């Protein structure tokens, strides 16, 4: 897991493929987009714009991916994301290969970050993460998740 702020993107230390993907997403002006999927570079890089209310972590499950890296960028509101190191997800459901995700009930040695608008978090394949968790009181957030095919890092 890595995190940073859009305003200091050039010094964030991201792999060039991730920096390019985030730059493409920002150029597409996600804050002005309706919720939905937007292709940036075919299936290699796309973004999902979403608006929803944050929830208690006990109401949510962690997610894992195999083929894609997640760059979670908060546009409005405040969001807590719980996460763990690769291999720490427990009580996992069947993997959905077509949509590249698996849901898990728990994360061993769970950690947390709080995102504010303009902040992003990067989750590599295999790193469990539970986005959309409440900070204080539930509230509406708008975010974009940039999906980057992991083999672009090769």
UniProtKB/Swiss-Prot annotation:
Protein's GO biological process: DNA damage response; N-acetylneuraminate catabolic process
**Which key words are in the record?**
Cytoplasm, Zinc
Example of a GO cellular component annotation carried by this entry: cytosol
Q: Which InterPro entries match?
A: NanQ (IPR049827), NanQ/TabA/YiaL (IPR004375), NanQ/TabA/YiaL_sf (IPR037012)
* Pfam families xrefs: DUF386
Provide the cofactor list for this protein. Zn(2+)
UniProt note: phenotype after gene disruption: No visible effect on growth on Neu5Ac at pH 7.0 and 37 degrees Celsius. Shows slight systematic growth delay at pH 6.0 and 20 degrees Celsius. No visible phenotype on glucose.
MF-aspect GO terms: racemase and epimerase activity, acting on carbohydrates and derivatives; zinc ion binding
> What does the entry say induces or represses the expression of this protein?
Negatively regulated by the transcriptional repressor NanR. Induced by N-acetylneuraminate, via inactivation of NanR.
Keyword Transferase recorded: no
Instruction: From the Swiss-Prot or TrEMBL record, state where the protein is found.
Output: Cytoplasm
Task: State where it is primarily located.
Answer: cytoplasm
**Activity regulation text:** Inhibited by 1,10-phenanthroline.
Q: Which reaction does it catalyse?
A: N-acetyl-alpha-neuraminate = aceneuramate; N-acetyl-beta-neuraminate = aceneuramate
Q: Which domain of life is it from?
A: Bacteria
What does the entry's cofactor note say about binding and number? Answer: The Zn(2+) ion may play a catalytic role.
What's noted about domains in the record?
A His-tag on the N-terminus blocks activity, while a C-terminal His-tag does not.
Q: Which family does it belong to?
A: Belongs to the NanQ anomerase family.
Q: Write down the NCBIfam families for this protein, in alphabetical order.
A: acetylneur_anom (NF040884), YhcH/YjgK/YiaL family protein (TIGR00022)
Per the entry, what this protein does is: Opens both the alpha- and beta-forms of N-acetylneuraminate (sialic acid; Neu5Ac) to provide aceneuramate, the preferred substrate for NanA. Has preferential activity on the beta-anomer rather than the alpha-anomer. Accelerates a reaction that is spontaneous at slightly alkaline pH, facilitates the reaction at acidic pH.
Name of the molecule in the record: N-acetylneuraminate anomerase NanQ
Q: Which organism is it from?
A: Escherichia coli (strain K12)
């Amino acid at each position: 897991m890595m995190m940073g702020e859009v305003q200091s993107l050039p010094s964030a230390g991201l792999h060039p493929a991730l920096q390019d993907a985030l730059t493409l997403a920002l150029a597409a002006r996600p804050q002005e987009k309706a919720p939905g999927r937007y292709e940036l570079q075919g299936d290699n890089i796309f973004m999902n714009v979403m608006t929803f209310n944050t929830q208690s972590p006990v109401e949510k499950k962690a997610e894992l991916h195999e083929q894609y890296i997640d760059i979670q960028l908060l546009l409005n509101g405040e969001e807590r994301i719980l996460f763990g190191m690769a291999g720490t997800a427990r009580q996992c459901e069947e993997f959905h290969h077509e949509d590249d995700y698996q849901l898990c009930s728990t994360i061993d040695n769970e950690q947390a970050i709080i995102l504010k608008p303009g902040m992003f978090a990067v989750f590599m394949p295999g790193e469990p993460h539970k986005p959309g968790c409440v900070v204080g009181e539930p509230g509406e957030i708008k975010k974009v998740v940039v999906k980057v095919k992991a083999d672009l890092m090769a």
